[in-house]
Amino acid sequence: MKHFFLRVEHMTTLASMYFACAMLALAAALGLFQIITRFVLEEPAEWTEVMIRFSLIWMVFMGIPMAFRQGAMVSVDVLHRWAGPRMKRVLDTVVMIASLSLVAVIIIVGWDYSLRGKVQTIIGLEEYSMFWAYIAMPLGGLFSVLGIIGNFFDPVRMELETAL
């Protein structure tokens, strides 16, 4: 069961990371398009600014699961190095519970925002509702839950590699 969960978690986390990378590429392409239309053609495309903002929102919330999976979000590396094996597991459990609590708030509030955003339209793209921007929060949160639990079952200690 644990092996199956970790396999599913790996696939979903990888998919969310690929999606986050695609959103970053989209934001960069739209930014270039906006510069060309505004400064070269002198005909600004207002919708690009909104789409850049939304693609960056999606990039962040879909990239968070990988950060949780790599152990880079909530790190207690100093305590982890000083603690014995038993205390390390207690620390891992506390970090997991705290992370899941935070993500639960993001999921609940994000879902509420999404439902409220159904009646709002996106400025510059009036045919679309704000639901599509806000749904990134609960969706990224759900993927993050899998990453958090996956890191608990199969810890990855990359805090020193990801530190500046």
Language-model segments: which ranges?
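Alpha-helical transmembrane segments and membrane-interface helix-loop junctions
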Residues: 1-164
